[in-house]
Every structure is written in C-alpha cells, then in structure tokens.
A protein has these predicted regions:
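Sec-dependent signal peptide recognition
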Residues: 2-10
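Short, exposed beta-strand-loop hairpins at the edges of beta-sheets
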Residues: 219, 225-226
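Short strand-coil-strand connectors
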Residues: 59, 219-220
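Conserved NTP-binding/hydrolysis module of P-loop NTPases
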Residues: 168-170
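Extracytoplasmic thiol/disulfide redox context detector
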Residues: 5-6, 19-166, 180-183, 190-213, ...
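Hydrophobic h-region of N-terminal signal peptides that target proteins for export
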Residues: 10-19
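Conserved, helical-rich catalytic subdomain that frames metal- and/or nucleotide-binding sites
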Residues: 172-179
Length: 238
C-alpha cells in the first residue's frame, strides 16, 4: 500500500477532475466492484492519472482502481505529483458539497437561531437521541448565534433510540421535544404512530458514510465526525 501511494505521488499530473453524483463511467467495473468489495458504487469516474485510474465513490468514501478492478487503493489519498494537491480531499469536499445542496431537509428537525445566518451559516447534523456526545453537541448548537441547524435523527444505538426518535418526530413541536430530551433530560412520552423519515434518514446516512453519531456537515463540504465545541463550529462557519 505504501509503495502504491508513493507511485501515485510521483506519477500524478495536474488536472481538474469534475464531480458528478451518481455518474457511472463503467457499468462493467461497477459490477466488479460490487462483487469484489461488497459495496454498491454511487459514482465512478475515469481520471487522467496513471493512464486511466478510476475514482470510485461508495458508502461515503473514495477509493481508486483500474478498469478491471485488479487492485484497489483504499484509505489513502491521491496526491498530484506536480502541485502536491490532495486530489482525494478536494474531490471529497466537492462531492459532499454537491450532495449537501440536495438534501431532503424536510426530513430533519430545523433549528433557527437569530436571523438563521441568512442562508450562509448552516450546519447539518446526524444524531442519535441516546448518544451522549450528541446531547453535548445539542447544548452547543442551542447557543450557536445566527445560524440554521438541520438535525437528521438516525437511531443507531438501540431499539429505545428508535422509540424516542419516533416520539420526537410525532410531537406537535419537534424541536421542543428534541431539546426537552437532549438538553433537559425530559424523555418524549407522546405517540409514535405517525409517518416518519427515519428509514430514509438511515439510508441517507449510509450514502454519506455516516457510521457513528454525531456527524456534522458544513456548506463548504467539510465533514466532521464526532463532537465539536462551539468555538470550532464557529471557525468552520466563517
């Protein structure tokens, strides 16, 4: 893996690689990847690197292979040897930004603090109601000035997480029910028998590569897994 990484660094040439979600440059390669790697590619593009290296986006991650799927570079970064630009990081940020611009925000709990940031200070979170660090994050987000926060509930931890998520979503005031539990420790007790987006949220989380909570996303395409204090959130919003 280290040798392949060094070869990539030495051989890559400067190029601008466009990012298009759900683009499959080779259906044959997609079938090979799905069989060998047990993941369904959401996007495959042919790059100008190394005589035809393919970039694959699946499960919220990028990796690389050739047209036959004979070898894979997973968990590393593709570095442009001329400019030393991290192609993988740039591509991931651009792709995440595109995906975030088309999120089904109606499936999230919406919080508007102050003037909401005028559309320029938006945070997307994925949270489980029984996640301790999610509760800590919520207490920070309550105090985030002039911003809009969209929270997608993804009950990952237990059956009780699913029950709480349903009750919060079915509450007359979802944000109030969420804060009552996450900030004040007052568990939701109302009905859980209403249509909810929880299954869709889980599929969305999988598509974005969210495998733990909390997870934060910013309009820039920046992705932060785990808890963040308020001051660091502010820095990413500037």
């Amino acid at each position: 893996m280290k040798l392949l990484f060094k070869i990539l660094m030495a051989a890559c040439l400067l190029a601008n690689v466009s990012v298009y979600a759900d683009e499959i440059a080779s259906s044959a390669l997609a079938s090979i990847i799905e069989k060998q790697m047990d993941v369904k590619p959401q996007r495959i593009i042919k790059t100008p690197y190394l005589g035809g290296l393919y970039e694959v986006y699946a499960g919220g991650e990028l990796f690389y292979t050739d047209e036959k799927g004979s070898a894979y570079l997973v968990g590393g970064s593709l570095i442009d040897g001329k400019t030393m630009r991290n192609v993988t990081a740039d591509q991931m940020k651009a792709l995440q930004k595109q995906i975030l611009a088309n999120l089904p925000l109606q499936d999230a709990i919406k919080r508007v603090n102050g003037n909401g940031g005028g559309g320029k200070r938006t945070v997307i979170t994925f949270e489980d109601p029984n996640c301790g660090y999610c509760k800590k994050l919520t207490r920070e987000l309550v105090n985030l000035k002039n911003a809009t926060v969209y929270t997608f509930m993804v009950p990952m931890l237990s059956e009780d997480s699913l029950v709480k998520s349903r009750r919060i979503w079915c509450a007359p005031d979802r944000l109030q029910a969420w804060d009552d539990w996450m900030v004040h420790g007052r568990a939701p007790t109302g009905s859980e028998n209403c249509a909810n987006p929880l299954e869709r949220n889980s599929k969305l989380a999988q598509k974005l590569g969210v495998n733990g909570t909390p997870a934060l996303y910013f309009q820039s395409g920046e992705r932060v897994p785990g808890y963040m204090p308020l001051d660091k959130i502010e820095k990413l919003l500037k």
